[in-house]
């Protein structure tokens, strides 16, 4: 009965969310894929939101001056490498690293990975020093001949720049695909040796799509999918952003108190929460599946999950600002959706993809974040 009540309660919340929050299309003039959204923190750009999308042979950049209420096209980053690009990442350098000043923007994308029969491929890095208005090619952190995907950036505990990515380059050693990283001590000018973060040399499993966030405690959290295990979403932690434990350990599957889990293209964000020094982690995946039979859950495409214990323990389902009820295994609907919490931890902006007719479009909306549970009070005598 308790579970039934909770299900009815969530259904009601979803209905209210759909009424109270009218989602808006970001730009109906062109298809958009693989969203990334960040809040800029430096100089005259502080407070602006920046979003990037894969748009054919270019990265499409948009800006919002009003915390995500409205968006305008800013520029395109042309990437000429045939046949096209995929799975781009967007990052603002939070402090000076080597010769790279704070506020530098990096945008990186996978190229050459969709050629028939495969061939030379790489992750190409572009840099902007003016808040995303103009971009120049910077360098190539990773190159190969089979497949390289999904660049993600961060700073480790030593303040070094790290690029995380998915790689198929070690198939001959048994890694069908793995998650790896490289470290730069000079702000991205040069890159160190490859380190495997998640991977098993069984010729089968395909971990991918890493997202990394630093927690207030100084620890780091990574979410990712593992195809070969249903493409389910997993989480693991690190003390320093570069030491992630035994790579063959799959980590902890992200499961809700409702008996569901995410599959495909997970992302994670951290938000402050009043009264909770840990803050809260917000995770979302493309599909919501039942734990018991892996069938689509009734709330598929309609929720994200919240965790207040640094990624351990239970996750709680919460209505998504942009519901995508027809989410399915496809590179458009609800694929790699973005959650960007407000600086005060009271709201969250979601940017999610949906089909508008036969065209993939980005939609956005802001909604309240869950408040911290109130501490229990002693009854008066």
Predicted regions and their residues:
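Bacterial N-terminal signal peptides that target proteins for export
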Residues: 1-11
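Basic polycationic patches enriched in arginine
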Residues: 6, 380-381
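Sec/Tat signal peptide C-region and signal peptidase I cleavage site
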Residues: 18-22
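Asp-box/BNR beta-propeller blade signature and adjacent active/binding-site loops
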Residues: 23-378
């Amino acid at each position: 009965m308790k579970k039934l009540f909770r299900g009815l309660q969530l259904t009601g919340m979803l209905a209210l969310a759909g009424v109270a929050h009218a989602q808006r299309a970001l730009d109906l003039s062109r298809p958009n894929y693989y969203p990334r959204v960040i809040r800029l923190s430096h100089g005259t750009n502080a407070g602006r939101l920046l979003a990037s999308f894969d748009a054919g042979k270019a990265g499409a950049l948009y800006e919002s001056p009003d915390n995500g209420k409205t968006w305008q096209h800013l520029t395109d980053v042309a990437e000429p490498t045939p046949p096209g690009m995929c799975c781009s990442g967007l990052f603002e350098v939070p402090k000076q690293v080597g010769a790279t000043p704070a506020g530098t923007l990096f945008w990186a994308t996978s190229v050459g990975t969709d050629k028939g029969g495969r061939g030379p491929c790489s992750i190409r890095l572009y840099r902007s020093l003016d808040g995303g208005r103009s971009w120049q090619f910077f360098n190539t952190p990773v190159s190969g001949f089979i497949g390289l995907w999904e660049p993600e950036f961060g700073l480790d505990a030593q303040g070094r720049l790290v690029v995380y990515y998915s790689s198929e380059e070690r198939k001959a050693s048994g890694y069908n695909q793995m998650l790896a990283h490289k470290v730069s001590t000079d702000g991205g000018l040069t890159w160190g040796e490859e380190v495997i973060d998640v991977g098993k040399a069984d010729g089968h499993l395909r971990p991918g799509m890493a997202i990394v966030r630093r927690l207030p405690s100084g620890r780091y959290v990574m979410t990712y999918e593992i195809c070969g295990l249903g493409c389910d979403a997993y989480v693991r932690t690190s003390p320093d952003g570069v030491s992630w434990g035994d790579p063959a350990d799959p980590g902890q599957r992200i499961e809700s108190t409702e008996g569901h889990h995410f599959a495909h293209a997970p992302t994670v964000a951290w938000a402050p929460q009043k009264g909770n020094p840990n803050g809260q982690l917000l995770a979302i995946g493309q599909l919501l599946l039942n734990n018991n039979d892996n069938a689509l859950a009734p709330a598929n495409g309609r929720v994200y999950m919240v965790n207040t214990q640094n990624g351990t323990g239970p996750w709680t389902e919460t209505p998504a600002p942009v519901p995508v009820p027809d989410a399915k295994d496809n590179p458009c609907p609800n694929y790699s959706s973005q959650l960007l919490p407000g600086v005060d931890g009271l709201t969250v902006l979601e940017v999610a993809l949906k089909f508008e007719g036969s065209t993939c479009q980005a939609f956005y909306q802001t909604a309240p974040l869950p408040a911290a549970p109130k501490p229990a009070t002693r009854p008066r005598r």
